[in-house]
Structures are given as C-alpha cells and as structure tokens.
C-alpha cells in the first residue's frame, strides 16, 4: 500500500482524484508544510519519519484516523467508521471523501436491519416533496388539502387528549399519596391516643375491631408488636445482655471441645452465616458492613443460646431482621423469644411435625375446597407433601419472598390473629401463584414458592385480597 509521501500529484492511486490544493489543506491542518518540490515538480515532500496509510483517512482537529477503505462486512467495523465520520465538521467530511474517493453512503448506517413498509426506498424528488403529505409515505398518493387538514385536527385532538390523560393520572397519584398520608396520620393518632393508652380494653371495642388489618403505622409498630406479643417469659431490659454474656461463655467453651458439641457448634455457625447472606438483601442495613449487621448477629446468637433445647434453625434471621427494623435490640430480643415461644411457631422452629399435622390438614382441606385443580396437581400428580412446600414458608415467615412492606403487614396481622391468619395468607399466595404452580416439574413449583420473589402488587390491595378469601 502506497503512502501519501509517494503519491503523484497528477497521477497514481490517490493523485488521480485528489487535487494538489486539497492535499496542501490536509497537511496544513496537521501542521505540516511542503518543503519544496522534487526535481520534476510532481511530488509533495514531508518529513521522512511521517508515513501514513492512504486507505481511508478521516480527519478531525486532533489526529488522523485511518480506517480501511474496504470495510469488513461486520456491523462493528461499519459502526466505527460511521461514528468517526459523523464527528467531523461538514468541511472535514467533504475533505475526507475527496481524499479517499468514496461515497458518503459508505458511512451511513441502516436504522433497521429488516425493510420497513413506512420507510421510503429512496429520496423523494423536489417535485414530489412539494406535494407530500405529513406522515404519509412518499410512494403513496398525497392527501387532499381537506383530508390533510382533517387529519391534522384529529392529531391535535389526540395529542391534547393524551396530555389531559397524563395530567389526570398525575392528579390521581398526588391525591392517592395525600389520602395515604392523611390515613396514616389518623391511624397514628388512634393507636397513640386511644389504643395504646387503653390497652387491651380498647381493642375489644367494635370501633377498633380489626384495625390492624389496615396496617399499623411504622411510627408505633414496634410498640404495638411488643404489647400484642406479650411477655409470658417475664424478660426485662437485662435479659438480652445476660443471654449474650452466656452465649459468649458457651461459645468459648465449645470452641475448646473436640467432639460432637464442637462439631454441632460449627454447623450452627455455618447455618447462621448462610442465612445472613439472604436476609433482606435489598436493605443495605444488613449487608456485611451495614449498621444493623452486628446487632442481628448478636440477637440471633443470644437467642440460640438462650433456648438450650434448640440450636439455630434457618429462618430465624428473617424475623429477627424484621423486628430490628421496628425496635431496639433489647426489645427485639424480648419479642423474638416470646414470639417463638408461642405453641404454633415453637412447633415450626423446633420442626415438631406432629404438632403441625392439624394445621396442615386444615390448609389442605381449604385448598381442596377453593382450588381443587391446584390441590390435585400438587398432591396427586406431583406427589408433594406439606413438609415440602408449606413448612419452608412457615419457617421463613414468608419474609424473603415478599417486599418489606408486605412482610410488616403480615406480622401486623399475625401478632393479633396467630396461626388462623396463615391459612388465609397461604390461600392468597397459592391463588396468585397458580399459573406458576400448575407446571409438571416439581422443581419449578418449589422454586416459584420458596426461592423467587413474589409479585403480589401493592400491600393494601394484597391484604384486601387475603381477607376476601372465605375459609368456611
């Protein structure tokens, strides 16, 4: 390939189409000036250590960009050339085309890979452009003036209608936010001034029956949960610190052992670490460097050593994290211990399947009544049992699969209604996930139930759906 240093001004592969003035302008823009002509006056000399390929020269203000004239068929190469060419000024584009003797179409990229019926096959003539209609392909007959005016009026009406619709939707959204804030303020006043001051007598009034179903405001949620859970274990402020101190002592003792107890301890620690990695990953509060990470670990270890009859069971971290989002560490420990001491959750977290049989049977009877097709598919066709697809949900308290808002609403209702609420909740979830559960692969069914995030919609709508389900 020849270099521009040896190209003849009047002949040669480039000289045949590049004038001397164009070449001078090209070199002058780069700071090079001809030192003179050769003996025959036909050559333009430059510094001997500056040689450039003359395949395809694209100029800009900073440097020479050489792109091969024979562009590869790959779209990436064409895209690179087109992008380089598009950055040039109009004068530089013209100069680049003159230097390379190529057509501008080389740099033009097609917008669509496939032909489009609405794209013109070629540029319209000046005569056709004079009569073309707006928004109409050039190869079709133009509209009449009356029709074009009519369509323009209709277009303006459609545009105005769309703008009115957008404004209306924005007003509705603002109104919904205002109503939600107003309702939240009302509920805060009711809980603080009426219910908490007159606990528990106020809840017996028909005026406040089922008020927790509307959602407990986050401002008072922690205090309400504490009162609703109760304190049958008679724990106080020092209970957490005593449990944590005992945990540290027992941890040190078990580290020194070399037999079964030490192995069990290592298994518990491993299970705890695995659980922490999947606890509310959307909240940075519980990440490795999160501000609540240490509190959560301390809470779980203190509780696991507080209950000598059980080791750490996967799932405890989810409810522990939810409690820490709404109350301080000592209150969270007291609530966790008292909550998991209730008969139903105690059976869940100690894996006492015999105590869960009545709950399983009630749920299966309700499922067969409300969703017979789904019940037949899960129990007969896939041969699943409640321990496969119900127990893991109860152990996790549904928290990993739902949004934090819905998880809080679930605990709002459970602390007042206990295990009967879980029947309605399970039915609502199975109804909403029914299309994903009617597949023939049990692995996909279990994945949809136990490992995927559920799209249940806004929390208010979902909770209304839960309570609309009839259990009778």
UniProtKB/Swiss-Prot annotation:
- Please provide the Gene Ontology terms (biological process) for this protein: vesicle-mediated transport
Q: Name one GO cellular component term.
A: Golgi apparatus
In this protein, which residues make up the domain named Rab-GAP TBC?
Answer: 215-418
A single GO molecular-function term is:
GTPase activator activity
What Pfam families does UniProt report for this protein, alphabetically?
RabGAP-TBC
What is the designated name of this protein? TBC domain-containing protein C23D3.03c
What is the scientific name of the source organism? Schizosaccharomyces pombe (strain 972 / ATCC 24843)
């Amino acid at each position: 390939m020849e270099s521009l240093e040896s190209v003849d001004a009047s002949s040669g592969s480039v000289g045949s189409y590049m004038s001397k003035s164009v070449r001078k302008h090209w070199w002058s823009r780069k700071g090079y000036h001809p030192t003179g002509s050769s003996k025959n006056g036909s050559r333009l000399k430059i510094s001997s250590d500056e040689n450039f390929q003359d395949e395809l020269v694209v100029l800009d203000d900073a440097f020479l960009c050489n792109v091969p004239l024979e562009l590869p068929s790959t779209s990436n190469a064409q895209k690179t050339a087109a992008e380089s060419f598009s950055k040039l000024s109009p004068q530089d584009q013209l100069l680049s085309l003159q230097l390379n003797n190529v057509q501008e179409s080389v740099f033009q990229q097609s917008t669509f890979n496939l032909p489009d019926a609405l794209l013109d096959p070629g540029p319209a003539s000046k005569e056709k452009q004079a009569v073309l209609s707006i928004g109409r392909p050039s190869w079709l007959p133009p509209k009449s003036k009356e029709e074009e005016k009519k369509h323009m009026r209709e277009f303006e009406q459609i545009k105005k209608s769309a703008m009115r619709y957008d404004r209306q939707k924005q007003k509705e959204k603002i109104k919904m936010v205002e109503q939600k804030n107003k309702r939240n303020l009302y509920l805060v006043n009711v809980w603080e001034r009426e219910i908490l001051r007159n606990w528990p007598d106020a809840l017996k009034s028909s005026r406040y029956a089922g008020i927790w179903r509307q959602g407990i405001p986050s401002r008072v949620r922690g205090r309400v949960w504490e009162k609703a859970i109760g304190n049958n274990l008679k724990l106080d402020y020092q209970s957490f610190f005593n449990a944590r101190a005992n945990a540290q002592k027992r941890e040190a003792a078990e580290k020194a052992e070399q037999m079964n107890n030490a192995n069990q301890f290592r298994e518990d620690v491993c299970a705890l670490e695995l659980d922490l990695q999947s606890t509310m990953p959307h909240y940075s509060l519980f990440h490795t460097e999160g501000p609540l990470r240490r509190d959560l670990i301390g809470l779980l270890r203190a509780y696991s050593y507080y209950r000598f009859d059980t080791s750490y069971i996967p799932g405890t971290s989810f409810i522990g994290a939810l409690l820490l989002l709404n109350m301080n560490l000592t209150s969270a420990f007291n609530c966790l211990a008292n909550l998991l001491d209730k008969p139903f959750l105690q059976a869940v977290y100690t894996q006492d399947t015999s105590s869960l049989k009545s709950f399983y049977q009630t749920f299966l009877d309700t499922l067969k009544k409300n969703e017979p097709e789904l019940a037949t598919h899960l129990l007969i066709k896939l041969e699943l049992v409640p321990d496969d697809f119900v127990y893991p949900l109860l152990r996790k308290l549904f928290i990993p699969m739902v949004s934090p808002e819905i998880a809080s609403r679930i605990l709002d209702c459970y602390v007042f209604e206990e295990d009967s609420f879980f029947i309605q909740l399970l039915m609502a979830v199975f109804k909403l996930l029914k299309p994903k559960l009617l597949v023939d692969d049990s692995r996909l069914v279990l994945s949809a139930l136990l490992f995927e995030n559920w799209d249940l919609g806004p929390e208010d709508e979902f909770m209304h759906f839960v309570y609309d389900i009839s259990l009778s």
